[in-house]
Amino acid sequence: DVNRFPVDYLRQVSQLLHKTNYKAILPTHEEGWLLANGKQFLPQSLPIALADQEQFEKLAGKIAFAETADLLGLPTPKWEYVKNADSILLDYPYWLKADYGTAGRSVYKISSKKDLAEVTSKLTASDEEWMVQQDIVGDYGQVQAVFDHGELLAVHSSVKVGSGAGGSAAARLSIESKRTREHVEKLGQYIQWHGCLTLDFIRRGDQFYYIECNPRMVEPANAYKAGVNFPKIMIE
């Protein structure tokens, strides 16, 4: 279990790399963050396109990404830091989000005082930081990109047409979008990102609002069908 024994996971990766000549490692979830933070346990010649620990820290958390997006002028929903339930000023509905969490865990839609009261205990149950983000009605989508130390190599945007677990996209429709390309390129250049980067957005009319960042590759099949082979680009 990588969550319970992260160092053991890193050591096992190192052992596998010494035994077999792997051409590439392709992180598809939070193991990308772990590999960036645990490089001391891994071979120096790690076959992976991966950003540094400091770069991950600017994007991996929901709060850090919101701060970085504000700094760059990227469009996001209104958001606030949460000290306690009484400190929230946003109008209903909004999303209460732990700094680190997924759509199925530590993310709650708050539409009333009753909703907030039901999750208030979670705000003090741990040292986790929280934020609230205004709910926006629109089409959920993602823009995926690959960077080589800040240089954009490939990009693909899509919107959800079918829902999966936790509201994720089980089916996607590729779209042409100059704006999402410009936005993700601006972010990648600023961070000097290396590897895959994915931004989640809500499309409302012709505007895109970025709600969080996945500093990794997400499902690549739709992009492949649209002519963008992210795994191949990462390997090469």
Identify the residue ranges that each predicted region occupies.
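Phosphate-binding site of ATP-dependent enzymes
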Residues: 111-191, 202-210
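Active-site regions of enzymes building and remodeling cell-envelope glycoconjugates
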Residues: 1-3, 45-48, 95
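ATP-dependent carboxylate activation and anion-phosphoryl transfer catalytic cores
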Residues: 20, 176-236
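Glycine-rich, highly charged phosphate/nucleotide-binding loops
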Residues: 1-15
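Active-site nucleotide/adenylate-binding loops and adjacent lid/helix of ATP-dependent enzymes
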Residues: 55-137, 147-151, 178-181
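Short glycine-/acidic-enriched loop or helix-start segments at secondary-structure transitions
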Residues: 35-38, 105-107, 142, 222
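A short, GP-enriched loop/loop-strand-helix hinge that lies immediately N-terminal to
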Residues: 19-60, 73-80
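Glycine-rich phosphate/pyrophosphate-binding beta-alpha loops
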Residues: 104, 161-166, 170-172, 214-227
